[in-house]
Amino acid sequence: MSPPELNTTVPHSARIYDFLLGGKDNFEADRAAAAAIVEASPSLPVSMRANRQYMTRVARHLAAEHGIRQFLDIGTGLPTSPNLHEVVQRVAPEARVVYVDNDPLVLVHARALLTTAPEGETAYLDADLRDVPSILGADELKATIDLSEPVAVSLIAILQFILDEDEAHRIIDQILEPLAPGSALAISTVTAQNAHAVAGAVAYRSRGIQTKARTEAEVTALLRGLELIDPGVTLVHRWRPDPDRPLEDDAVIHMRGGVAFKR
């Protein structure tokens, strides 16, 4: 199946994210949407950087402290260094990573993600989060990841685009069901307990990008049935922060997340 055509006249969440992180893979529609969203929610760029740093800490922790060597990153977005495979292969060069996204521009830049350590492996899969069977059944995944061994699944800054809670739970359940015990799920999503985050979600919706802010209870429920590790579900900058990095004020962080294990 051919990938969807790239429409540069309509803003896309991945390209807005790229622009607000200082990237260059975006278009006028994305920049205009980003300006309107930041006007409504001025701390959004700070929060996005904090979320990216959270991904880095989570990936490093799972590789270094839990020995996970297989990673499935769904909703990859545009390349932003350090990418997940770069983080985990610094810990374990033999680590294997599969990236999943369905944005045409990400497809164009996939080669930038596929520079792997010689001992490891990195693959890219064009698929939609909502179609879990197409992800888990893909030849690219089967050639890279052994589902009989633990896998760390990364759903970072993507679940806010799944508006229905039942659908979000179904997606997570379908992903985790075939995974081996010892597998992990890392999530982050927009919190409803921050006025700036809620304003940002409203601004995204005004630009045609359906977005949901979740309560702490709703975020915690996404990890139901799993063994949550410390510090639990928290604002992303407070998840095992780097001791040598100044901690941002809670008021500027829009994302809440956590990491849990399948036992």
Give the residues covered by each predicted segment.
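Rossmann-like AdoMet
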Residues: 1-127, 131-144, 254
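Conserved beta-strand signature within the Rossmann-like core of class I S-adenosyl-L-methionine
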Residues: 151-155, 171, 179-190
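Short "lid" loop at the C-terminus of a central beta-strand within the Rossmann-like core
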Residues: 158-161, 190-194
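Class I S-adenosylmethionine-dependent transferase superfamily signal
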Residues: 174-176, 223
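Short, glycine-/aromatic-enriched active-site segment of Class I SAM-dependent methyltransferases
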Residues: 192-208
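Short alpha-helix
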Residues: 210-234
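Core SAM-dependent methyltransferase catalytic element
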Residues: 232, 238-263
